[in-house]
């Protein structure tokens, strides 16, 4: 019974977690604005304006290092505080 309860808690926790694979709004691996590996505006490997983690820690222009060949990053200002943040900050706020 104890094992069942632990499994149930894990399932609920995973279900409640933010979607880091949201496509347009970033996330850890993919997305239009971020992701560690790719994305239009961020990512550690490639991205236009992002930074080390892309859209994950902060929004449209944020990120840790400023991206490779980009102009964003920590110095430019972390525009949005949310996970996989959008243009205005927060989670899932970019719109389209």
Curated annotation (Swiss-Prot):
Its main location: secreted. It is found in: Secreted. Residues 23-89 are annotated as: 12 X 4 AA repeats of G-X-X-G. GO terms for cellular component: extracellular region. Residues 1-18 form the signal peptide. One of its GO terms (biological process) is innate immune response. Keywords: Antibiotic, Antimicrobial, Fungicide, Immunity, Innate immunity, Repeat, Secreted, Signal. Sequence repeats lie at residues 23-26, 31-34, 35-38, 39-42, 43-46, 47-50, 51-54, 59-62, 63-66, 67-70, 77-80, 86-89. The keyword Cell inner membrane does not apply. To H.diomphalia holotricin 3. This is Tenecin-3.
């Amino acid at each position: 019974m104890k094992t069942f309860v632990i499994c149930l808690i894990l399932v609920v926790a995973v279900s409640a977690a933010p979607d880091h694979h949201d496509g347009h709004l970033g996330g850890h691996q993919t997305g239009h604005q971020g992701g560690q590996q790719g994305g239009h505006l961020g990512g550690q490997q490639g991205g236009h304006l992002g930074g080390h983690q892309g859209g994950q820690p902060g929004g449209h222009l944020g990120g840790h290092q400023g991206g490779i060949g980009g102009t964003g990053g920590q110095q430019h200002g972390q525009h949005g505080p949310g996970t996989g943040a959008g243009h205005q900050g927060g989670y899932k706020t970019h719109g389209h």
